[in-house]
A protein has these predicted regions:
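Residue-level recognition of phosphate/Mg2+-coordinating polar/acidic sites
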Residues: 23, 48-66, 112, 123-127, ...
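N-terminal glycine-rich dinucleotide-binding loop that anchors FAD/FMN and/or NAD(P) in oxidoreductases
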Residues: 26-51
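Short beta-strand to alpha-helix junction loop
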Residues: 44-47, 65-84, 133-137, 165-168, ...
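Glycine-rich loop(s) and the adjacent beta-strand/alpha-helix scaffold that form part
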Residues: 123-169
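Glycine-rich FAD pyrophosphate-binding loop
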Residues: 7-32
Length: 302
C-alpha cells in the first residue's frame, strides 16, 4: 500500500519493494481469521480507507458489529488486489530480500540485503510492520533500521492481546462471561468495553480484553512491574442490574444460600460465595466490581 500510494503521488518515481519473505502479504492474508477485517465503521476516517480499497477493486460488506470485510471474506483476495495494482503501476517487487542494515550518505541511502545485494536509493520508506506474529515475518526490523538511522524509538509493547493477572484464578480457566469490563489507572477510568471475557490459566482473554489492553501503557523508564500495578481491571458481570444488592437481598429470602444461582457460571458463583461468606453486600460488590491487577500483556505471539 505504501508503494502504491508513493507511485500514485509521483508517477515518474522508480519504486522497488524489498519483501522479506518469498511471498507477498503473508500477514495480511491471515488477518481477521483469514477474512481480512479491513476497517470498522466506528473507526475514524474509515470511509477514506474504504475509498482506497475501492480504488483497488475491493468491494466490501459490513457485519452487524460494524466490522468491514471484502465481500468474498477472503484476505488473499486483498493481497491479490494489491499485487495486481503494483504490477499495473510498474512497481518492482524483490522477494526473499530481508534487509540487514541501511547506511545514509549525503546523496542517498545504501540498503544492504542479507544475501549480499546492495541497492542505492534517494528516498527510503520503511513500512515493515510491527513486531507481533514473527511467523509472518514481522520481527521488529522496521524499528531496528529506523533506530540505526537516528530516529527515536519508544518502548515496544504488545497491543490487542490477552492480559496476565497478578491474582491466581486458574480454577476459573474456561469460564466465559458476557460482561462490562473497564480499565482504570490510579482510580481514573481509561476505557470501558462490553463483551465476553474468557478466564484462562494465566489471566483473561476475549475481544473486549484485547480492546482495553492497548490502553495499558508503561512510560519509558518505569519498571514494568510497578507500571502494571498502577492499573486495575474491573468487571461488572451484571451491568443490566443497577440495584443488585437489593435484588440479592430479595432472592435470599426465597433461595436462601442459593441466591446467586443462575446469575453467573457455577465456578464463579462458588468463588464469590467463598469470598463473601454470607455478606450479601460483599457478594454484590464482587459481581458489580470484580477487581483485578494486570501483571503483564500476553506477548507478541498470542
Amino acid at each position: 500500500m505504501a508503494a502504491i500510494t508513493a507511485k500514485q503521488k509521483n508517477k515518474d518515481a522508480k519504486i522497488i519493494v524489498l519483501e522479506k519473505l518469498g511471498v507477498p502479504g503473508k500477514k495480511l492474508g491471515a488477518t481477521g481469521n483469514g477474512k481480512c477485517n479491513i476497517s470498522n465503521i466506528k473507526c475514524e476516517h474509515h470511509e477514506a480507507v474504504l475509498n482506497v480499497f475501492k480504488g483497488l477493486g475491493i468491494i466490501t460488506r459490513t457485519d452487524k458489529a460494524g466490522r468491514i470485510y471484502p465481500c468474498s471474506e477472503d484476505a488473499k483476495d486483498v493481497v491479490r488486489a494489491l499485487v495486481l495494482s503494483m504490477d499495473r503501476l510498474g512497481i518492482r517487487v524483490k522477494y526473499s530480500s530481508p534487509v540487514s542494515h541501511v547506511e545514509k550518505n549525503k546523496e542517498d541511502f545504501e540498503i544492504y540485503i542479507e544475501k549480499g545485494d546492495r541497492i542505492k536509493s534517494k528516498s527510503l520508506l520503511i513500512a515493515a510492520g510491527g513486531k507481533a506474529g514473527s511467523k509472518f515475518g514481522t520481527t521488529g526490523d522496521g524499528t531496528r533500521i529506523a533506530k540505526s538511522l537516528g530516529h527515536s524509538i519508544t518502548r515496544l509493547v504488545p497491543s490487542l492481546t490477552a492480559v496476565e493477572l497478578k491474582e491466581e484464578l486458574g480454577f476459573l480457566a474456561g469460564v466465559r462471561e458476557k460482561c462490562e469490563i473497564s480499565l482504570w489507572y490510579e482510580e481514573k477510568l481509561i476505557r470501558k468495553e462490553y463483551g465476553e471475557v474468557q478466564f484462562t490459566g494465566y489471566g483473561i482473554s476475549g475481544i473486549c480484553v484485547f480492546n482495553i489492553s492497548k490502553y495499558i501503557v508503561i512510560p519509558e523508564g518505569v519498571p514494568l512491574k510497578s507500571g502494571f500495578e498502577k492499573y486495575r481491571i474491573k468487571i461488572d458481570f451484571l451491568p443490566e442490574i443497577d440495584n443488585l444488592e437489593e435484588v440479592l437481598e430479595n432472592r435470599s429470602f426465597k433461595l436462601q444460600d442459593n441466591y446467586l444461582i443462575s446469575l453467573v457460571k457455577r465456578a464463579l458463583t462458588e468463588y464469590i460465595k467463598e469470598k463473601s461468606g454470607k455478606d450479601i453486600s460483599k457478594a454484590a460488590k464482587m459481581l458489580k466490581s470484580f477487581t483485578l491487577t494486570p501483571k503483564n500483556l500476553r506477548g507478541w505471539e498470542f
